[in-house]
Structures are given as C-alpha cells and as structure tokens.
A protein has these predicted regions:
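Rossmann-like dinucleotide-binding cores of NAD(P)H-dependent redox enzymes
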Residues: 139, 149-203, 308-312
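Mid-to-C-terminal Rossmann-like scaffold of FAD/NAD(P)H-dependent oxidoreductases
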Residues: 2, 269-366
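FAD-binding core/adjacent interface of flavoenzyme oxidoreductases
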Residues: 1-5, 61-139, 213-216, 226-228
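A short, polar/charged loop-to-alpha-helix boundary motif
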Residues: 365-376
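Glycine-centered tight beta-turn/hairpin loop motif at sheet-sheet or coil-to-beta transitions
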Residues: 89-91, 215-219, 316-318, 354
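Glycine-rich Rossmann-fold phosphate-binding loop(s) that bind the pyrophosphate
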Residues: 8-11, 122, 143-146
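FAD-site-proximal beta/loop scaffold in flavoenzymes
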Residues: 116-137, 211-214, 219-287, 292
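Beta1-alpha1 glycine-rich phosphate/pyrophosphate-binding loop at the start
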Residues: 2-68, 153-175
C-alpha cells in the first residue's frame, strides 16, 4: 500500500492519519478536508468557546506529522471504487490504495428553501456566527433538546441571555432515559431556562429568521435563534460508489466498508450483531473507530475490533455528567456513592437478572475506566 487518502477533517480523520504514522506506516498520506481550517475539535464549540473563555483557535487539534499532506477546501463529490479514485469539487482526482471515509456529518436544518438566517452549530464558522449574534442579544430560542441543544442553552444562559428551549420530546429522554434526563432538565429549570414542548414540531418564521411558530405556543421571537435538531451524515458523494449506506456508511465491527475502504466517526454506521446498523456520533466513538479503521487498512487479515465506545460526556447547567453503558437507561438507578440530592453521585443501572448495564457520575470525580467497569 503506497498511498492512503483520508477524506475529512474531523477528529476521526486526524486520529486515523495519526494512527497510521504511529503504527509505522511511512507511505504517502493525504488528508483532504472540505473546511478551510486545519483539523479541530468540535467539543469546546458549544462550551468554552461559545462562553468566551477560550478563543476559536484553541480548538485546533495537535499538529499531524509534517510528512502528512493536508489539503484544505477540498470537497469530495464522487468515489470510483473500481479505479480507486476520489473526485473533488475543484475537478481534481486523487488516487489511493487505501481510503478512510471520515467526512462526518452536517447540521440538520429546518428552514425552508430560500429562507435565510438559520443558525446552527457544527463548525468553527458556525460558532463564530453565534458568538457575534450573542454579543448583542438579550433573548435566545434553542430549537432542539438533545445534547447539543441543551449545552447551547446552558452556555447562552450563562452568558446572561434569557433562554427558551423548544423540543418535540421531553429533553434528552430518548437519548439518556427518564432519570438522567430529569436531572439535567431540573438543572436547566433552576438556571431559569424555559422548557417548552412542541409535539408537532417547529417552523422558523421571518426571512431572515427572527422567530419560530409551534403548537400550542404560537409565534415566539428572540434576538438569537439556533437550531439543534440533529445531524445528517455526509454520504452524498458516495451515492454511485456501491458502498452500503444506512444513515451512514455501513461498516463491520472492524470499521471496514469494502476491501481497502474503511470509515470512522459520525459518518460511519456500525453493523451490530443483529444486523442493524447505527451511528454513534460521539467524540470517544470517533477516536476509537478511527484508530481501528487505520489498523484495519494496515493489517486486513487481523483487523482490530471497534465496538462503539460505551461512554458519553456532557457539561451543562453546572452538572458534569459522564455516562457509560447502554442508553437510554430505564427506570431509577441504584446510588453507589454520594447523593444525587446534594448534586454529586455515582449511580448504576442493572438488568432484571442483576447484570450491570449502565453507570453515570454527576459532579463526581471518577476515572473513566472505573466508570466503564461499573457498566459491565
């Protein structure tokens, strides 16, 4: 294998490239990203950077080895697997012996065609746009109450904005389960954030956007409106490639999509033992998958297993919550340490036959390895 092409500029792309070099592979290595920025972490965008305690530049990931050819503003438009080539929007074509698909995902939008001014948070440029608006805003509406929506609401509230969160479902309940979701919702309410349910969904109004409409609440306006309603894997450029796509690029437990082609991060959809494929769009999953994907390219006969990392983390409304295991976690957990009522605890869920299935810490310092062990 003489040349590996990594398409993408995310943590998965950077980790895959770094792993190839760390494993001693010294062939030609190209990282082609559609962004104009060198690879960076998205984790602080909704937290420290939006809060203003860190500069945008601080999100940059560690530099890749100097012999890695990083090409920016390169948007992939087609993959020719037979000829082992990727075509880019500028007309250039890059051949490869091994390919890492790490094109990530983009923010899902709810604006109608031709409607301008919808703000989302996915990239550094998105963060810069929200920060610019927040500097003069007094009120904010966040549409969506998943991890990103709630973290946005937390940071904007901490900045002093009057924040309303609107969601179709109970905040975080579908992701975390009732107990954990209730803990974070209660913290949001204590912080003065209004939580509104809109089972029929939300429509953006104005052009440019200056409000929302939803039932049963009618029309609402705010100085700052941000949509946080999920993401869409960037797979369009693979439509004629013959690769299986189900929400993301379907890969096996070794992150292999096809011979010589691997995928990792938010764009990858791992096939489970039951045959169902699902994405796990979390930072730890991206890192784990990218390392395994790179090793699978180097060592196809003995690829490394890349199960979705059973660990997520969020920080919002004064709650530092780390969670390991199967989510959503049903019912009420057992308290192992601390006291949830006092704001600091370690809790655990067990199945009907007594097996640990999940564990979480709330403002409680515990090593990730130990927390993960409590979920198995």
């Amino acid at each position: 294998m003489r040349r590996v092409l990594v398409v993408g500029g995310s943590i998965a792309a950077a980790t895959a490239a770094g792993t190839l070099r760390a494993e001693g592979w010294d062939g030609e290595l190209i990282v082609a990203s559609d962004e104009e920025h060198h690879p960076y972490s998205r984790v602080p965008l909704s937290k420290q950077i939006l809060m203003g305690t860190q500069e945008l530049a601080s999100s940059a990931l560690p530099e890749l080895p100097q012999d890695v050819d990083i090409r920016l503003s390169m948007r992939a438009v087609a993959l020719d697997r037979m000829n082992r080539e990727v075509r880019f929007a500028d007309g250039s074509v890059v051949g490869f012996d091994g390919l890492v698909v790490a094109t990530g995902a983009r923010a899902r939008r709810i604006a109608v065609p031709g409607q301008h001014g919808e703000l989302v948070l996915r990239t550094r440029d998105d963060a810069a746009a929200i920060i610019a608006r927040a500097e003069t805003a007094a009120t904010a509406i966040v549409v969506g109450a998943g991890f990103l929506g709630m973290e946005l609401a937390s940071t904007l509230s901490h900045r002093g904005l009057d924040v309303t969160v609107i969601s179709r479902f109970a905040p975080l309940s579908q992701l975390l389960g009732p107990w954990l979701a209730a803990e974070l919702t209660a913290a949001a309410t204590r912080a003065g954030v209004r939580m509104l349910r809109a089972p029929g969904g939300v429509t953006l109004i104005g052009n440019p956007v200056d409000g929302v409409a939803c039932s049963p609440h009618g029309a609402l306006t705010a100085d700052l409106i941000v949509s946080a309603v999920g993401d869409i894997a960037n797979t369009e450029w693979l439509s004629s490639s013959g690769l299986a796509v189900a929400e993301g690029v379907v890969v096996d437990q070794h992150c292999v999509a096809a011979p010589g082609v691997v995928a990792a991060g938010d764009v990858a959809s791992l096939r489970t033992g039951s045959g169902v494929s699902r994405r796990t769009p979390h930072w730890t999953s991206a890192v784990h998958q990218a390392g395994a994907a790179a090793r699978a390219l180097l060592d196809p006969p003995r690829p490394h297993r890349a199960l979705p990392a059973p660990y997520v983390w969020t920080e919002q409304f004064g709650v530092d919550m780390k969670i390991a295991g199967q989510l959503p976690a049903p019912g009420t957990p057992q308290v192992l340490q601390g006291d949830p009522g006092q704001g600091s605890a370690v809790v655990q869920w067990r199945s009907d036959d007594g097996r640990p299935t999940a564990a979480a810490s709330l403002n409680f310092r515990i090593p990730i390895v130990k927390l993960t062990s409590l979920a198995r």
